[in-house]
């Protein structure tokens, strides 16, 4: 998905604000550790509405190759998304896969180029196309598949004077503990905190992403965020001191995904 574009400002803006609550200092950060890098390749497409059914068929056709890569361990997850909040300059669809190495990501991409699926008629009909490559060190998921889930993505941009470890601090202090609880409850199937691995935009941005298994999960996560903020309303002040709120954007997409 284009994990850098917009919807509903309330969303995980609240989660980002809550992320600085760190109560007490170091109590939660000592429990959350960085994981090995997880790389995600996202291919975004703006497809004319008349070709949306063909795009769904193209996603189905690609599934066999992705499932084979998942089974072999080349990748650890894959999926496709349909954008639910349309913008004049945005994508309508995307396809993505994740691996614990750049080689895993690139090997799958090479397979698609070799098979000719990247030049299919429906992709040729796209009015816009762009790719993104992200890396995460804070993430988790449940093994299995999700059909017609909801992925919520929030983009934030750090201020120039923000500390070098700001994203790590946000992640360890609340984002991971909060979303781990939602994962354990089955409210979400996956989450990650992403930064660009290949910078197609200026450095300093990060994403908070979670996949709700159903629409009710969006409300449950939002409720958990609101409770976290109530526990320390000053958290938003600290978060605002390190992020440029004018650059904040959200995205909501319908997701089919599988994880190893």
Regions found by a protein language model. Give the residues of each.
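N-terminal secretory signal peptides that target proteins for export/translocation
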Residues: 1-7
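Bacterial N-terminal signal peptides
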Residues: 10-20
